[in-house]
Amino acid sequence: MAIEGAPVGWMQDWSAVGSGKNAHIGVLLVHGFTGAPPSMRPWGEFLHSKGYTVRVPLLPGHGSTPEDLNEVKWQEWPAKVIHELNELKKTCDTIFLIGLSMGGGTVLNVATTNNEEIKGLILVNPWIHLKGVTVEVSFLVSRFRKMRASVGNDIKRPGITEWGYDATPMRGVYQALKMLRITRKNLAAVTVPVQLFHSVEDHTLPVSNTEIILAEIGSKDKTRIELVNSYHVATLDYDQELIFQNSLTFIEGLTP
């Protein structure tokens, strides 16, 4: 079923032009699988309040119905991010990419081929593999089962929703795993500084995702920050302020 009750105007691309000395610095924030811009927009608004130019796109197949996500090819997700990156380049000479969950995997994919255009990456509970599930297995499952129970809204803080789908499209999972397998093979090509936030208690993705990325990425400057009071969608959880402030410090440290 379609998403109901989401804030008006939030289930679409959002952007804001920066001001002052930070206006030339762009930040692109990408939501996760079955999620939507509401999971990243508060972060984007925080960074915009500090003068940065920000863009929070809606990935193809999201923000409408789960059935739409079953019709998307994985190449559409990095293509959307690259489009947004090019939009930022029109006014910004320094750009950071931020990704939550599959959004993290997507910005990593983009960084493997656009490394020189990116100043740094910030990842929150990024997805790079699905333990025990191969691309081939997910393909077979998707042929016989279109949907499964939702994996979204893994938030510790009561009364908070990420406004995502109430079901998991299995063909979409297959496409995501295809993208992530290719991304993982090329992680060594990513050499920009990386800040990675990881929830100690994550009911959606195992810690192996964080460990794989930190072990296989080509970046020498990589920092891991543990979140002890948030679940998977940490950008909306109790550690939100910690994420916001540390990301600001990371960006400021690379743009003196």
Where would I find each of the regions flagged by the language model?
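Conserved alpha/beta-hydrolase "acid-adjacent" motif
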Residues: H203-N209
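Catalytic active-site module of serine/aspartate enzymes centered on a nucleophile-bearing elbow/loop
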Residues: V228-P256
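Gly/Ala-rich beta-loop-alpha elbow adjacent to hydrolase catalytic centers
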Residues: G99-G103, V107
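Active-site nucleophile loop of the alpha/beta-hydrolase fold
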Residues: I122-G132
